[in-house]
Amino acid sequence: MGSVDGDFEGLQAADRRAEVIEWLNALLPEYCLPLDSSDDELRELLSDGTVLCHIVNALIPGVLEESWGAYASSDQHAGHVKKFLAVVADMGLPGFSVKDLEEGSMSGVVDCLLVLRESVSSGLRDGTSKAPLRKKWRVPETGEPLVPGVAQGKTSPGEDKRNGLPDPKSQQKTPIFNGRKLREIFQLKRGSYADLPAAKISEMMHSNSLDNAPTQSLLSVVNGILDESIERKKGEIPHRVVYLLRKVVQEIERRLCIQAEHIRSQNVIIKTREDKYHSKIKALEILVNGTNEENQMAINRLQIIKEEKSKIEEKRKLGEQDVARLMKEKEISENTIASLKKEMEVMTSMHEQQLQKIELTAKQMEEHLTTKIKEVESLLVQSNKKIEEVEAASLLKSQLWNKKEGIFQKYMNSQQLYVKGLRISSWSIKNEMHALEMELRDEMSNFGSGLKCLVDAAENYHKVLAENQKLFNEVQELKGNIRVYCRVRPFLPGQDKKSTTVDYIGENGELLISNPFKQGKDGHRMFKFNKVFSPFSSQAEVFSDIQPLIRSVLDGFNVCIFAYGQTGSGKTYTMSGPSTSKQDWGVNYRALNDLFDISLSRRNAFSYEVGVQMVEIYNEQVRDLLSNDIAQKRLGIWSTSQPNGLVVPDASLHPVKSTSDVLDLMEIGQANRAVGSTALNERSSRSHSILTVHVRGLDVKNGSTSRGCLHLIDLAGSERVERSEATGDRLKEAQHINKSLSALGDVIFALAQKNAHVPYRNSKLTQVLQSSLGGQAKTLMFVQINPDVESYSETISTLKFAERVSGVELGAARSNKEGKDIKELLEQVASLKDTIVRKDTEIEQLQLMKDKVKSPSFAVDINGASMPKNSNSDLRSVLSITTNQQSQLSDPQSYAEVNRDGGPTSYTDITPTCLDEADFEDNASEDGFSGGTDYSVGCAAGASVFPNSCSDRTADTSIRRISSRIARFSLTKNGQPATSRPKPKDTAPKTPNQTRVQSSQLIGGSSLRASKRWQK
């Protein structure tokens, strides 16, 4: 093992030596010492101290300003080493001994150089200055001639031999070129080589200065001459400069050849040393294999020790478990003792109070008796004195004293009787105190019974108050008022909780807001809503109040819930929740989860189908959040109530079966939603998010259907631009958000004033909410406010808007239920539409083939019979009437109602009657209609090509059957026929284009595709 450790230490020392050599080659490339050099080779390079001085000057330029020649005495070499050691000592670094450099171990020298490298590199990183060190070691120049040695790039003598350079001793007789003149030539500025005299160039050539010059200097001379030739206009160079350039290039080529030869020799040396290291490695492997048995024995002993250690640890764990169990038992006993002590202290305090009262009474009696006894004792003392005086005075008066003794005896008896009476009176006083205590207890019990009566009366008052609130809510529901729930956001971490604008939150929806800038009565304002949630209300508490409203969706009612408030007030927190954990679920997740639970409990009586749409309104554009298409087309909005309840029919509708499906879709929608960072909120919603849940129910027993629609809307926050510090895209988003919220305020104001015209078309948001705000739906609004003082103005404006919303009466909501007969009727109408679409397609194909041979006024069929082109208009008119009757049956009240946007609406008058095909397509794209089958002008005329075909007969039979059923179902309860909307008399006759547009709308429109989604 000892030999292995020694070899390892030797390898480690070799690695450190190679690291120092690599650093020296990078710092002084002219030496180029091989990396696998031994300690002797490194000592040979560093022994004269010249390289050490060059290292100091290279790391800290100017510290030792002196040239060191290749030929110097041993004393000068020792002086160079001492200078290096002095510089290292002044830097506060460990040095080495001169003997180590001469014949000792080189480990100290290697460590010193590594520490010097690390110190200088760390000093350069820290930006420390070396100016004091330079000033301290600045050596004045001497008059001795400088031999161009290592300072000008000359290597040491040993290195000269290895590199094949001529020995400097053979060049002692050559003329020595002064170093200062050499620097003058090599440091000439651009454009001055041509002015260099020939005598100086010849002197430099004959003095052999090019052999001693550094390679970098020679390259700089070449570059300078070439640059000067380029800058000259004619490119002429003097012959002396050309000669100088040739000599410099030859010198560079010679050095490159020498360097290549040196590299080849070094490769041979490296190969031999690599073989030597391989042999050493094999020897080390043999040594390692020999120690395997010892290692196995040590491993066995270690395994036994580990087993004993594991046993000890198990015992220690058992002991710790016993200690923990005893500690728990001790804690339980201590808690029991503490509880008993508390009970004992309570009982002791009660007894002490009673005892103090009794002791006070007894003390008073004792004091009174003590005074009486003292008086008796004083009388006894006086009597004894008198007896003694009488006995001492005269025995003659004994008889007199005997008489007096009898008198005193009687007096003592009377005094004893008096003391006995006092004792009896004390006992009577105690009995009176006991009687008083009993009376006090009776009075306390009577007081408790009276207090209980008061508590019962207060509970009855709260019950009556709750009943009144329930009746008020029922009245509000009958009126169709928008329910308004207010939720106060809690303070964020770091905010001052004392500076709040919310002064009071009542149990019945009262909210008192204080103005921090005003005092007195003017600084407070009271608001009244259906419910106010405090900052400490949980998500479950918020949902429990709106749960009955959401459950009515399964009964066929339309419900709309939207959150309104400024940016950062918690709208998304209320609607979606901060995370997908069940505890933090918002209204969206809880509503869908509740719908699935109820549908599961009713599965024996009803069958429900649930579909989810999720869109957003971003910069007045409707985008589908559940679509995989990134470059989405613009989605349209239906401004009228459709039979299938779809407001945005082109948005993707995803059927869901469980809560997990909803969570996956909501994650996709939240990831696609537009959010951004503002000064008010790090993740601010930059769009209006609309989650629509479509529920279709089927009664298993009677086959009737119900359709409910739940809109869960998370509005973007209203914000002031100066507070949000929005710029660029954020400013544009804020402008669109404020514009849409302003349009919503205009709609609410018009509804509150009951105006005939309600501006729903001013914004995409109000178009989506038209079906909810326009009546026939249960609507609820969450108002989110910030309690901090800085948001006071936004809070007041938000609450004023909510107060205006709470006064809007929408009318009683209606259930969208359809009987079994109506369902069959709708299915027959859908099949009839499909038949007409197929027939029109066939007619269009045949018409294109026969257009050239047909007359403009009549169309000839295959058998030669002719008939008018508009013979198919009867079929289309019946289809139009059927569609109108269908809308009456599915929604009887909406047929007679007047659209708040300016007039009555139905399917037949959605399309303008005075527009051509291009105008209709433009308007349809603006209003959100997606076009169906495109009919040409000849399509209407081609309806008479096959008048006696089987398809016509089947269609006529279906129309007659549907018309009879419509006539039967259109009667009211009193047996009177239902009134239909009168047709305007001044309507212009329909053109073929108008007929084509209406047939396209009725047969191939997006309403047909949307209705089929629920029939799959």
Swiss-Prot record:
**Domain Kinesin motor, which positions?**
481-808
Q: Which domain of life is it from?
A: Eukaryota
Coiled-coil stretches noted in the UniProt entry, renumbered to this chain: 288-354, 820-852
Region (Disordered) residue spans: 123-176, 884-912, 971-1016
Q: Which residues bind ATP?
A: G565, Q566, T567, G568, S569, G570, K571, T572
In terms of InterPro entries, this protein maps to: CH_dom (IPR001715), CH_dom_sf (IPR036872), Kinesin-like_fam (IPR027640), Kinesin_motor_dom (IPR001752), Kinesin_motor_dom_sf (IPR036961), P-loop_NTPase (IPR027417)
| Any single GO CC term annotated in Swiss-Prot or TrEMBL for this entry | microtubule
Pfam families listed in its UniProt record: CH, Kinesin
Q: Which residue stretches does the UniProt record annotate as biased composition, category Polar residues?
A: 884-893, 990-1004
Gene Ontology terms for molecular function? ATP binding; microtubule binding; microtubule motor activity
Q: Tell me where in this chain the Calponin-homology (CH) domain is found.
A: 14-121
UniProt keywords (A-Z) are: ATP-binding, Coiled coil, Microtubule, Motor protein, Nucleotide-binding
Sorted alphabetically, the Gene Ontology BP terms of this entry are: microtubule-based movement; microtubule-based process
Which family does the record assign?
Belongs to the TRAFAC class myosin-kinesin ATPase superfamily. Kinesin family. KIN-14 subfamily.
Protein name as it appears in the record: Kinesin-like protein KIN-14K
- Organism of this sequence: Oryza sativa subsp. japonica (Rice)
